[in-house]
Each structure stands twice: as C-alpha cells, then as structure tokens.
Amino acid sequence: ARACGNTVYSDVHLGDWGLQIGLVIAELNERNPGWKCFSEDFDPDKDSVPELNADLLSEVYPFASKKSKEDEAFKEKAHIATFDLQNGRAGYIALWKEILRVSIADLKSNYSKLGVDFDYWYGESDADKYIPELMKILEDKHLSYESDGALVVDVAKEDDKAPMPPVIVRKSDNSSIYATTDLATIIQRNRDFAPDRIWYVVDNRQELHFTQVFRCARRAQLVPDSTDLEFLGFGTMNGTDGKPYKTRDGGVMRLSD
C-alpha cells in the first residue's frame, strides 16, 4: 500500500491488557508475595517494582497458563488480577509497566533482526480510555443486552451459512475482553487517523473474531460506511506434531534462538 503512494500507519497492537497479563501478575504474586507492588498501600511515587527480564516472563506465562487450567482458585486469582489492573490498582499498574518495558524491548530486538518496524507501539491498554464511550454508543443505539451476566451484541445475518454467535463486549465479572478493546481501538483509529482502510494482518484462526468485531462496528457506526475494515489472515508456525505453536502452552522455541 505504501509503495503505491498511500499514506500508511503501522501499529503492532500489543495484547497488553487482558487475562494473559493477569496470569503473569497472579503467578508473580504467588512466587513473591512480599513484593511491595502486591500491597494495597503501594505508592507509585515512593515504591518501585523489581526489575524483570524476558527469560523470566517467557517461563512464567506458560507456567501460569497451564496452572490456571488445573487450579480453579488460581484461575480466579488471575481473573481478579486482570480486573484490578484494568481498574487502576497502583501496584499492578507499576508491575504491568515493567512487564511491558521488558516485552517491548525484546520484541523490538527480534523485529530489528527481521527488518521490521512499526510507526506505533500501541496496545490494548491505549484503547482503554475509549471503552466507556464504546459502551455508551452500544447502549444508546440499543445494541447491547445482558446474556448470562455478560453484555453482548448480536451480529448474525439472515444469509449466514454457519452459526454466528453474539460478540461479548463485557464479561460477567465486568472486565473487558479482546473484542471490547478491538472495538475501542476502531474508535481510536478513526479519531486519530480517519483512515480510508484499516487492515488487520493476523492469524487465520482469528477470522471469526474479526467478523464479529467488524459487524458490531458497522452496526454501531463506529466508522463511516466508506471506511474499509479488512481481515488479512496468515498461517501458523507448527510443531513436529502438526499443531500450531502456542506461547501460553510453553515448549516453544523462541524466535531469538
């Protein structure tokens, strides 16, 4: 697109605001309960968090992910940590910033070796401030409704060849999820750039998710009808068993290696 003379802005869009962060925070808490950032009286102006590194985070995340599938109490702890982070708990915000610092430095190092760069290093967290506006739009347009404690929006069409489930915009515990931040990000991008096209270059397995998100965005008129929302899927790196690598499952060769 850029080679054809178009003005193009690239954004890495980090997954830095969901359960994966809550899992890491919960596991670090279990291993290091004495860290000041886990105290209710953490003061960001006076207190600090320990310095982390990429090797530690690469070990903690898959460990915590596996643990959450076997331990319901830990899974609930991770959900609570996610909720508290998204609601501004000071110690968690400070720890999150350290996790982000380490992660971005590691990503930039790898991308540099591949000759890849981005104009923006935004994450889901950058769209967080647009979520209240998103929820109000969905409510004012009578698009959102409660289902089993969660808030959802119908996106099915009469000519769908396969079932199209509603998109969940708020979980039953009132926390935001992937779709919430993706919809809020559409508001952000339209506000910042007023683009003619927004392309999502992501894993093929995300196609259903983005179909739901795009349909919801259209129903809510988050972008003008003239703005194209397009999913550009790519394949996966698979292991010897033929199954895609999953960072959260562990045992995956790091790109830097």
Explain the meaning of each model-derived region:
Residues 2-257:
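NTP-dependent nucleotidyl-transfer catalytic core
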